[in-house]
Swiss-Prot record:
Organism: Clostridium perfringens (strain 13 / Type A)
Subcellular localization, as worded in the UniProt entry: Cytoplasm
CDD domains found in the cross-reference section: AlaRS_core (cd00673)
Family matches, as PANTHER family: ALANINE--TRNA LIGASE, CYTOPLASMIC, ALANYL-TRNA SYNTHETASE
Gene (UniProt): alaS
EC numbers on record: 6.1.1.7
Main subcellular location: cytoplasm
UniProt: Zn(2+) binding residues: H566, H570, C668, H672
Highest taxon in the source lineage: Bacteria
Protein name in the entry: Alanine--tRNA ligase
């Protein structure tokens, strides 16, 4: 067989099926759209589910893709074996009611044996036990040797998930060994031994399984095939694992270079290198597709992968930041197939760098605490770390659970995961109760998401805010209805509408719908999971009926304000690029009638000067009264024209480009003003950080901007009145008063210090002796941590062989400190152990060295009991 690189294989597959009249689609982003059942795209057919289920019409009945996928179900095995990985590419060709078995089987054989040139005596085929149709096609339409076809049962060659569409499948296998297997038993044995590997699965979706377990023929039969690019690459390159194929090996070589480690010399180092290689690739693609590190959902998947790779870098001796340098190798090997990687390379590097820096801070503090837990366990001969301690590491210090488990496993220890999960559940319930429960009509089981896929609503609301239409669907959260009566709430679909459905960060329109028999207010307009325009309504008079003519009217004033804010968002985006740099990209947005919110990539808080420049630039462009122009064109034309595309969006072949004069040009389906002058005024309200490398600006326009400025002006007047000065002198007056307060605070601190300095002799009067060791305890009032340490140090210097424990109620918070003379340590004194027990009594925690420790607490009323506890602990230590 001729060697073929992974990039060549990808192109050959897609080109082959294009020659069979398939539409080639670019890979969908890893973040699923309108699919709450998936955290990340994990299969080639996953983003095409709406086409298979009939919720949406496919752009063509024949489609071929190479889909980016992430699977983390067996992440613990990644690195430990050379077969497991989290990122992979799935080659697929799909038919939605077009061709079926008699076409795909000979095509598959043609591609494998002719295009790829795989020897026929290295191939085996499996079919479902009683799929005679597939057997007949294999033996009549291809030249496969019939003795190389094996019939297998449901577990191997039938695809189904509960009830619904399902069907048999045929799989194609490659034999890495010598000689021919003759029986099913020999075939299965060779497969279990990894001598024979499956590399292409052709699923024939031809049945609908009902609740009783009956298999009924589908009217529309579909084809869903999947071939892992990495798997076929191992075959075509004559290697036996994914880390040896050309693209992945190049990334592995980069990992070796960055860690100064050599692959293949040390088993443990190989594990770390494979983890860095795989996870480095996955995090690059995840960030490119818009995922941000966080503590939940797909953001946590990203954080977990990144931190696991970072830790294995440390195990290889890496000091500091290095994972961001892996991006170059990923871009070099995948950039041609996924050009968005090249466009976002610098941004991806910065996000990884920020997250790795944060992790290095986390791991240092968390590791110290975890190792202290492990030391305690070893002293007590315990094998299981408590769930409460692991949860404290996770919740308080941000130390990943998986990292705790991995380190414990390396030490031969276990984690009480059941109690960890219990702690996690309790915390989530507390959070849920704190924010309150909320719901919105439109769950995936609701009738609103079961509307027939053939129903189409024409949107005609860019110019028209009022039009006549026909009701084609009515319903509520329980069922479809022929009529909705006064007082009832529900949803309504029409054949055309002027109502904009919530999308692209812009809220849906509101307004009213009238007919001969009644009137309803439209409270919102959204798209259901199938992309249909859904008007959420409340009938306020009479009734609305299915099939009747209605008049739809959008709230024009509200729409006008939304348009102002949406166009201003585009202008803000461009202004940020000009002021901060081209690395700025939209990360999210929200536009309603009152305000706009814009999230964007940037790595530091904006200075006042930068904010002023951005705001001024937007207002200057507003005052040019530039025409806002919209044009439809192909995606390639839009990109070539310089239009801004959002890198986590999946665009159709035809797109809408919105231009504000020669200042801003973006792909957008939203509603906008006719010219920039309609916006009137733009005012930034706030700027803040929302995640690593993501900033947020909130702003107002038009009348809302005037009201905001009026509010600010009134606040200035009120402040001037309180300070008894002119508005222009407010800053000077506040600065003077702040200086005066600072001087007074300094005087108070000096007085407190003098009081403390003379206190050591009084404190020593209460000294007691325990088995030859002196113990001094004292409770003080309003002494800060620094002064308390100074006092403890002075008392310690007056002891011959002893320990001092001091506690202070400082404004409702407890400060604790313990110090011991060096010779007392030989008698068993350990300040860290003492302070840990003492702190628990006042509702706090802490620790430290044998000769010095400190802690805090929140229950000052228990200080006396805490100092009694100090005496008990010292008595135990110096027996």
């Amino acid at each position: 067989m001729k060697f073929m690189g992974a990039n060549e294989l990808r192109e050959k597959y897609l080109s082959f099926f294009e020659s069979k009249d398939h539409l080639r689609l670019q890979s969908f982003p890893l973040v699923p759209k309108n699919d709450k059942s998936l955290l990340l795209i994990n299969a080639g057919m996953a983003p095409l589910k709406p086409y298979f289920t009939g919720l949406e019409e496919p752009p063509k009945r024949r489609i071929t893709t190479c889909q980016k996928c992430i699977r983390t179900g067996d992440i613990e095995n990644v690195g430990k074996t050379s077969r497991h990985g989290t990122f992979f590419e799935m080659l697929g060709n799909f038919s939605f009611g077009d061709y079926f078995k008699s076409e795909i089987i000979p095509w598959a054989w043609e591609f494998i044996t002719e295009t790829l040139g795989i020897p026929k005596d290295k191939l085996y085929v499996t079919i479902y036990l009683n799929d005679d149709e597939a057997y007949d096609i294999w033996t009549s339409k291809t030249d496969v040797d019939p003795s190389r076809i094996f019939r297998l049962g449901k577990d191997d060659n039938f695809w189904e998930i509960g009830v619904g569409p399902c069907g048999p499948c045929t799989e194609i296998h490659f034999d890495r060994g010598e000689g021919k297997v003759e029986t099913v038993e020999e075939f299965l044995e060779a497969s279990d031994a990894d001598r024979i590997v499956e590399f292409w699965n052709l699923v024939f979706t031809q049945f609908d399984k009902d609740e009783e377990g009956n298999y009924n023929e589908l009217a529309q039969k579909n084809i869903d095939t999947g071939m892992g690019l990495e798997r076929i690459a191992t075959i075509m390159q004559g290697v036996d694992n994914i880390f040896e194929i050309d693209t992945v090996k190049n990334i592995l070589n980069k990992a070796c270079e960055l860690t100064n480690a050599k692959y293949g010399e040390d088993k443990d180092k190989d594990v770390s290198l494979r983890i860095i290689t795989d996870h480095g690739k996955s995090v690059t693609f995840l960030i490119c597709d818009g995922v941000q590190p966080s503590n939940e959902g797909r953001g946590y998947v990203l954080r977990r992968l990144l931190r696991r790779a970072a830790r294995h870098g440390r195990l290889l001796g890496v000091k500091g930041i290095f994972l961001n340098e892996m991006v170059d190798a990923v871009v070099e090997n995948y950039g041609e197939a996924y050009p968005e990687l090249r466009e976002k390379a610098d941004y991806i590097k910065k996000i990884i760098k920020l997250e790795e820096e944060r992790f290095n801070e986390t791991i240092d503090s968390g590791m110290d605490i975890l190792m202290s837990y492990i030391s305690e366990m070893e002293e007590k001969n315990e094998k299981v770390l408590s769930g409460a301690k692991a949860f404290k590491l996770y919740d308080t210090y941000g130390f990943p659970l998986e990292l705790t488990q991995e380190i414990l496993e390396e030490k031969g220890l276990e984690l009480d995961i059941e109690n960890f999960n219990k702690e996690m559940k309790e915390q989530r319930e507390r959070a849920r109760n704190a924010r309150g429960e909320s719901s919105y009509m439109g769950s995936e089981e609701s009738p609103v998401n079961k509307v027939d896929a053939s129903i189409v609503t024409e949107f005609d609301g860019y110019v028209n805010l009022e039009l006549n239409s026909k009701v084609i669907v009515l319903g509520n959260n329980e069922e479809f209805k022929a009529e909705l009566k006064e007082g009832e709430e529900g949803f309504l679909l029409t054949d055309k509408t002027p109502f904009y459905a919530e999308m692209g960060g812009q809220v849906g329109d509101r307004g009213n719908i009238t007919s001969e028999t009644g009137m309803a207010i439209v409270t919102d307009c959204k798209k259901n999971v199938g992309g249909k325009f859904v008007h959420y309504i409340k009938v306020i008079e009479g009734s609305l009926k299915e099939g009747q003519e209605v008049k739809l009217s959008v709230d024009a004033s509200r729409r006008s304000n939304i348009c102002k804010n949406h166009t201003a968002t585009h202008m803000l985006h461009e202004a940020l690029k000009e002021v901060l740099g081209d690395h700025v990209n939209q990360s999210g947005s929200y536009v309603d009638e009152e305000r706009l919110r814009f999230d964007f990539t940037h790595f530091a808080a904006l200075t006042e000067e930068e904010l002023e420049k951005v705001e001024l630039l937007v207002n200057e462009k507003i005052m040019t009264v530039s025409v806002v122009d919209t044009k439809e064109m192909s995606l390639d034309e839009a990109r070539n024209s310089g239009a801004t595309c959002l890198f986590d969006e999946k665009y159709a072949e035809k797109v809408r480009v919105v231009s504000v004069g020669d200042f801003s040009k973006e792909l957008c389906g939203g509603t906008h003003v006719a010219n920039s002058g309609e916006i009137g005024l733009f005012k930034i309200v706030s700027e803040s950080g929302v995640a690593a490398g993501i900033r947020r600006i909130e702003a107002v326009t038009g009348i809302s901007a005037l009201k905001f400025m009026e509010l600010k002006n009134n606040m200035l007047k009120e402040a001037a009145s309180m300070l008894k000065c002119n508005e222009k002198d407010i800053a000077k007056r506040i600065a003077a008063q702040a200086h005066e307060l600072k001087e007074k605070d300094k005087e108070i601190a000096e007085l407190k210090a003098k009081l403390v300095q003379g206190a050591e002799d009084d404190i020593l009067k209460d000294k007691v002796e325990i088995n030859g060791v002196e113990l001094v305890t004292a409770e003080l009032k309003d002494v800060d941590g620094n002064s308390l340490r100074d006092l403890a140090d002075k008392v310690r210097n007056k002891l011959n062989n002893g320990i001092v424990v001091l506690a202070s109620d400082n404004g409702g918070k407890v400060n604790l400190v313990a110090m011991a003379t060096k010779n007392s340590l030989a008698n068993g004194v350990h300040c860290g152990k003492v302070i840990k027990e003492v702190a628990a009594v006042v509702g706090g925690g802490g620790g430290g060295r044998p000769d010095m420790a400190q802690a805090g607490g929140k229950n000052p009323e228990n200080i006396a009991k805490a100092l009694e506890k100090a005496k008990e602990v010292v008595e135990l230590l110096v027996k």
